[in-house]
Amino acid sequence: MAVKVYENVVSKDQRKILLDYFKTTDDLVDSRPDVRSKTPVWNQTTNWPQDTVKQILDDIIKLKYDPEWIFFYMLRQYPFRPFPLHVDSGDGDQSKLHKNILIPLDLDGPATTIVFKNKWHGPSTRFGTTNVSPFRYEILNHGGAIQVIEDIRELKDISHLRITQEELDRLIEVRSGKVNQRVTDYTNIEGYDPNIKFDKQIHQQYLSHIPIENLHGLTIDSIIEWKLGDVITFDRQHLHSAGSGHSKKIGLTVTTNVGD
């Protein structure tokens, strides 16, 4: 089964512990206009609730596992965009990849994750047939209007924008990395069929932040509604995206490898 939802396995006390940690400001915080995140490292970072996360994982994973990536995040929906179509496959070593594990922690408005039947057998990447520069960004000005910046590297005056210089510098650094490279040729996506046209109604309701051209040829496996207390799992090779609709949501993603 590609997707499995474990219902009511995370207690209110466990969620509070994880939320309190996420909301604490420390050196791990990465704050940008559209997302705030923290990425502690398993068995290396101190003073984070690893034991709580391990309790949750041990309840749902029955084989030996190694957490590779721990990602706490808060997404703001409007006017920004949810996470795009992507895959969290690490370096792409198929022999070790196990599960994406998603733990909803808090939400404002209907929140969903869309998982596709299609798989990618390469390293982590984003997908889009339209080639958009990673340096194109939307930022609110102080009047509350969206300002489209075609290249944030060329942005010199930020006095009219709701972004600090520190946030801008960090954004440029992140957008310069390999993680922001994207696959525009879908030929090597498992299950891709160029004759399939993506459903317009589903696009409008759940994936309006992604150009529909980027979804043609793909097939949805599951549209998963976020519910507090649940844990969502699926194979790391599966293409997936955050759904549109929420105002704000906070979650924890853990990617695991098969343990030795």
Language-model features and meaning:
Residues P79-D260:
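Catalytic core of non-heme Fe(II) oxygenases with the double-stranded beta-helix
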Residues M1-M74, F80-P82, R126-Y186:
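Non-heme Fe(II)/2-oxoglutarate
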